[in-house]
């Protein structure tokens, strides 16, 4: 089963890290990522650009409203994600805990994925 690990943290804090601090966190995460890859669990990994680069589309009106910036103002922002192929939720949680030990602060949300393949859609 595939799981998404959604990585939330305080964007202002993370983007205030020095290059050395950021490189250390990324190197520590890379150790865990290599382990997950060797186990055949690691799928796509992405670090999102700052929320200032986001565009939000409000669909509660016609026509939809396109706005600069994130959908909501929150204490923590979605800063990245992992896609993992795990046997069960417990295995995905263990991977998230291991990633969390390498990354200070924030929180991880583990969520099962339902994959839709375009080739399987009716014409």
Report residues per predicted region.
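Conserved, structured core segments of small domains
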Residues: 1-123
């Amino acid at each position: 089963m595939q799981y998404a690990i959604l990585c939330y943290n305080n964007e202002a804090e993370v983007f205030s890290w020095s290059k050395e601090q950021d490189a250390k966190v990324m190197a520590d995460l890379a150790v865990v990522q290599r382990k997950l890859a060797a186990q055949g669990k690691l799928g796509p990994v992405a670090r999102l650009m700052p929320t200032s680069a986001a565009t939000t589309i409000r669909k509660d009106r016609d026509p939809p409203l396109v706005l600069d910036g994130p959908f909501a103002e929150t204490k923590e922002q979605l800063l990245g994600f992992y896609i993992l192929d795990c046997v069960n939720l417990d295995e995905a949680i263990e991977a998230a805990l291991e990633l969390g030990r390498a990354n200070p602060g924030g929180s991880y949300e583990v969520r099962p994925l339902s994959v839709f393949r375009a080739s399987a859609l009716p014409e």
